[in-house]
């Protein structure tokens, strides 16, 4: 499913990194999937994986010719958020900036509502 008003931002930096990784894998059908699971030090944890398919009900956000996919259960926790890619002293990684999180852990990989 693709919405006209996109409730999640997929930054150019994240899209360009996904495009680079897809090229390295030599599989143009790959999409970056972001999801939420229980766990981490704050209750919920962000996860990222590559997926070849879009399931019924998934939201897709496209940028730079690549797709970010979010399942409906995870989307409710990510509305208004941003998926970005950062490079810094702590390494390179995809990150979620989530306005719905009431608190996050020090590394930013888990949050609470």
UniProtKB/Swiss-Prot annotation:
Point out the gene that encodes the protein.
Answer: erpA
Listed cofactors: iron-sulfur cluster
Q: What does the record give as the function of this protein? A: Required for insertion of 4Fe-4S clusters for at least IspG.
- NCBIfam families documented for this protein: iron-sulfur cluster assembly accessory protein, PRK13623.1
Q: Name one GO molecular function term.
A: iron ion binding
Gene Ontology cellular component terms for the protein in this record: cytosol
Q: Which organism does this sequence originate in?
A: Actinobacillus succinogenes (strain ATCC 55618 / DSM 22257 / CCUG 43843 / 130Z)
Co-factor: note: Binds 1 iron-sulfur cluster per subunit.
Summarize the subunit comment: Homodimer.
Residues where iron-sulfur cluster binds: 41, 105, 107
Q: Hey, which family's this protein in? A: Belongs to the HesB/IscA family.
Report what the protein is called: Iron-sulfur cluster insertion protein ErpA
What are its GO biological-process terms? iron-sulfur cluster assembly
Report if keyword Iron is assigned: yes
């Amino acid at each position: 499913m693709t919405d006209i008003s996109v409730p999640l931002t997929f930054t150019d930096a994240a899209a360009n990194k996904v495009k680079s990784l897809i090229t390295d894998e030599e599989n143009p059908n790959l999409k970056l999937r972001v999801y939420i699971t229980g766990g981490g030090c704050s209750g919920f944890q962000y996860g990222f994986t590559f997926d070849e398919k879009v399931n019924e009900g998934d939201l897709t956000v496209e940028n730079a010719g690549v797709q970010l996919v979010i399942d409906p259960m995870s989307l409710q926790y990510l509305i208004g958020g941003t998926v970005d890619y950062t490079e810094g002293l702590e390494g390179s990684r995809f990150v979620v900036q989530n306005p719905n999180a009431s608190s996050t852990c020090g590394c930013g990989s888990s949050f609470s509502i």
